[in-house]
């Protein structure tokens, strides 16, 4: 009886170990689409499947982390940061997740990026650091926000200009 019980336990143990080693397959939705849509479950599946978290989209060379930051999908951005996505990647415009999160006043993402050691000294193609992206008066840069919102509204981007206006000084202080 003891031998039979031991054999069952060993077989069960091997079965559990084998299941634990099975690789999760990536979902059908690509990682950038999941980042745009805020589909945290799909992003987590990609992470478990070992998908390339730094895959660049062809238009501007943004990574899923940068995409999540733009669209304000904080949970997705935090999951990608925690999973080891490149926090200092620069797209074709030189923007990084930190510069973008700062400019769009995504405070929780800025905090997470800084905690992981994001480089505050990197500059975009206009020569601006994350701090400089929030240093000018809001009225001087409101048209940039409006252009961004117009371009990305069809994909679901909504910008709260009042929140951005009032949060810019807070973000600037975080970056000092």
What are the language-model segments listed below?
Residues 35, 47-48, 69, 81-82, ...:
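Ankyrin-repeat helical core positions
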Residues 19-30, 132-176:
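Ankyrin-repeat-protein effector appendages
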Residues 39-47, 73-81, 106-114, 140-148, ...:
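Ankyrin repeat structural motif
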Residues 8-16:
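Bacterial N-terminal signal peptides
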Residues 57-58, 91, 124:
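Ankyrin repeat boundary/linker residues
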Residues 33-38, 67-73, 100-106, 133-141, ...:
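Ankyrin repeat A-helix N-terminal signature
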Residues 27, 60-61, 94, 127:
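Start-of-repeat signature of ankyrin repeats
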């Amino acid at each position: 009886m003891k031998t039979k019980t031991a054999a069952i336990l060993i077989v069960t143990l091997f079965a559990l170990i084998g299941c634990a080693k099975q690789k999760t397959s990536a979902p059908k939705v690509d990682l950038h689409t999941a980042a745009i849509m805020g589909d945290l479950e799909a992003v987590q599946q990609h992470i478990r499947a070992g998908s390339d978290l730094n895959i660049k989209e062809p238009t501007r060379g943004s990574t899923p982390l940068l995409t999540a930051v733009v669209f304000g999908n904080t949970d997705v951005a935090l999951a990608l940061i925690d999973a080891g996505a490149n926090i200092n990647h620069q797209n074709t415009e030189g923007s990084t997740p930190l510069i973008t999160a700062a400019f769009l006043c995504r405070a929780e993402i800025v905090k997470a990026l800084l905690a992981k050691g994001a480089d505050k000294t990197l500059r975009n193609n206009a020569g601006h650091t994350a701090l400089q992206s929030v240093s000018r008066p809001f009225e001087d840069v409101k048209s940039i926000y409006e252009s961004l919102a117009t371009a990305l509204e069809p994909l679901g981007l909504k910008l709260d200009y009042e929140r951005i206006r009032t949060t810019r000084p807070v973000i600037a202080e975080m970056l000092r």
